[in-house]
Amino acid sequence: MIALCWNCRGLGNPRSVGVLRECVQRWDPKVVFLSEKKKNITGMKRVKVKLDFVNGFYVQRKGKGWGLAMFWRKEINLEIKSYSKHRIDAVITEEATGFKWRITGFYGHLETH
């Protein structure tokens, strides 16, 4: 299974959406995680449709925050387990075997202590 993670740095530019669509067409990922999307949920639903995905989960940006999104194909059995402004955590169950695996998309800066 292929998953695509992309730091968008904003999807306001139509060219950015076009490049993302080219990546999706080329690699045919079953799951896509986007960070720094800079779009509201309505805008991200449009992007999801342009990328030919059926399912999506969105973490709305707060103020000048960036926001997150995860899209997955119709045939993928994905359940969101938890989320925050920095991550989306999910479990995928494979239909044929019942095998479960975790996928977590996250965005943030490295903190040193």
Language model features with spans:
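A shared catalytic/ligand-binding motif for oxyanion handling
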Residues: M1-H113
